[in-house]
């Protein structure tokens, strides 16, 4: 049911050219949630579709009071659609669902139960255990999930499953990272921020209409994105830890080679055709100083970022929160 007051659940559905899927999807959502005693809404984000998707949504909105829809002027891709959907969401919980009918809305009640299990979780990610896709999608996906699990430190089988359930504070934490294709790493981002993440096997259906937007470059792009988000999240506040360590290793390696060349020259009076090795030593020392300088500059930028007032997310609180501080007028300082 929909409501004008507080909303329990918002379902964000990004879509691109899915006009044939929308009516059966709305029927499935209604059947799955209408008897759950929840106030809910579904926010469809049309990512610049060139078919009649938005017109179908406009027609369906007359039958489903919980339906809301927004449309981009052109295609900005899934991360932008999710970001807009998260900003539009009014629920205390936020679910995501793909519009191609491969995700089953009937799984959302199961995600709600899993979110409250074992003392409560903050994010429950679906796992397409029996995936209804060709090998050209499943094999690269398995490799991607294995590498992402190893790098991120959180063991999940299916980072890219479109069916997920978030508490609102996780959504707000994730918004700054919703660009490019980084939406695939939202469970890892939540885990790094200290939120409790769980996984739940969900039903996966074959695609009924249209064609997949999956491309062969997604595996390579995903691995590059993984390196990017790992640096941004883990070293945003301490870039010197990364660049300083690499710079120190490079400088030490160059210094060791330089010491060897110096000792050789001291003992024999010549470096014995070790000129390439000497050039390598000089290069390593220069690169080491450059990396160290990059880390120092990064620390200065991180300090400015921290002064902007952003603090790590709070999990629990005892007692009232402090009232926001207001700076006195300049003439009273």
Where are these regions (language model features)?
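Conserved catalytic loops of nucleotide-sugar-dependent glycosyltransferases that act on lipid-linked
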Residues: 77-89, 102, 106, 130-258, ...
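Membrane-embedded alpha-helices of multi-pass transport/permease systems
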Residues: 8, 19, 26, 105-108, ...
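Structured catalytic core of nucleotide-sugar glycosyltransferases
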Residues: 1-142, 147, 166-171, 192, ...
């Amino acid at each position: 049911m929909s409501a004008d007051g507080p909303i329990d659940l918002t379902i964000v559905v990004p879509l691109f050219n899915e006009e044939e899927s929308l009516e059966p999807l709305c029927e499935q959502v209604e059947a799955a949630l209408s008897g759950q005693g929840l106030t809910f809404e579904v926010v469809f984000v049309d990512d610049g579709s060139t078919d009649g998707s938005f017109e179908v949504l406009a027609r369906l909105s007359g039958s489903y009071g919980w339906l809301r829809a927004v449309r981009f002027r052109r295609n900005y891709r899934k991360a932008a659609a999710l970001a807009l959907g998260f900003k539009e969401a009014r629920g205390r919980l936020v679910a995501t669902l793909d519009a191609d009918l491969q995700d089953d809305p009937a799984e959302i009640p199961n995600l709600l139960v899993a979110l409250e299990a074992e003392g409560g979780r903050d994010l429950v990610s679906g796992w397409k255990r029996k995936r209804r896709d060709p090998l050209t999608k499943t094999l690269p996906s398995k490799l991607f999930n294995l590498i992402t699990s190893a790098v991120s430190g959180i063991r999940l089988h299916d980072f890219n499953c479109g069916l997920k359930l978030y508490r609102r504070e996780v959504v707000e934490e994730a918004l700054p990272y919703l660009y490019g294709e980084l939406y695939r790493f939202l469970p890892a981002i939540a885990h790094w921020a200290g939120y409790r993440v769980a996984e739940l096997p969900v039903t996966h259906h074959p695609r009924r209409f249209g064609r997949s937007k999956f491309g062969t470059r997604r595996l390579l792009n995903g691995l590059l994105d993984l390196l990017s988000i790992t640096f941004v999240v883990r070293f945003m506040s301490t870039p010197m830890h990364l660049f300083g360590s690499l710079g120190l290793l490079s400088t030490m390696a160059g210094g060791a080679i330089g010491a060897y060349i110096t000792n050789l020259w001291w003992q024999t009076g010549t470096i014995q055709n070790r000129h390439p090795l000497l050039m390598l030593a000089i290069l390593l020392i220069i690169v080491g100083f450059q990396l160290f300088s990059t880390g120092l500059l990064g620390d200065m930028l991180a300090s400015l970022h921290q002064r902007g007032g952003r603090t790590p997310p709070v999990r629990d609180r005892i007692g009232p929160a402090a009232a926001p501080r207001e700076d006195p007028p300049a003439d009273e300082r």
